[in-house]
Swiss-Prot record:
It is a multi-pass membrane protein. This is Uncharacterized protein MJ0565. The chain crosses the membrane at residues 13-33, 45-65, 80-100, 116-136. It comes from Methanocaldococcus jannaschii (strain ATCC 43067 / DSM 2661 / JAL-1 / JCM 10045 / NBRC 100440). It is found in: Cell membrane. Keywords: Cell membrane, Membrane, Transmembrane, Transmembrane helix.
Length: 147
């Protein structure tokens, strides 16, 4: 399988996930900035972390750079898809570890976690991190079939 034949797949995946990560990052940054200014905005899945939003934005930009490479028919397009997916997975793993640690605190009966629930830790980081498995697996298949 040649990278030129997979161009549409790479462009589509990179565009979709680039938009998901970029829009989520921008929303996260906006909510975080408003909370710094004293305004409280609550959206499901979003916690208002400015630096987390910047991380999501960086992953989205990496996906978009992959789109540019794929449109130019450059073999490096798979690398951008692969790298952005790995970073997205890393963000998801960190969110999952936070969920696990909070669950342990709840199960051990710690006072700070008395009112904890699973949906308290279900964040955009966890959702996007788990979704990043899709382009990761596809990029892995593409890279193994082009060698």
């Amino acid at each position: 399988m040649d990278i030129k034949n997979m161009r549409n797949v790479i462009v589509s995946l990179s565009l979709v996930f680039g938009l998901l990560f970029t829009v989520s990052g921008i929303i996260e940054i906006i909510i975080g900035l408003y909370s710094i200014l004293g305004f409280k905005i609550e959206l499901p899945l979003f916690v208002g972390d400015v630096f987390g939003g910047l991380a999501l934005l960086a992953v989205g930009i990496a996906y978009f750079l992959g789109v540019k490479k794929a449109v130019d028919r450059d073999i490096k397009a798979v690398s951008y898809l692969f790298t952005a997916s790995i970073i997205g997975l890393g963000i998801g793993v960190i969110a999952f570890l936070i969920l696990i640690s909070d669950a342990i605190g709840f199960l051990l009966g710690f006072e700070d976690w008395a009112d904890w629930g699973f949906f308290n830790d279900l964040t955009v980081y966890l959702v996007l991190g788990m979704l990043a498995i899709i382009p990761y697996r596809i990029a892995k298949i593409i890279s193994s079939s082009t060698t």
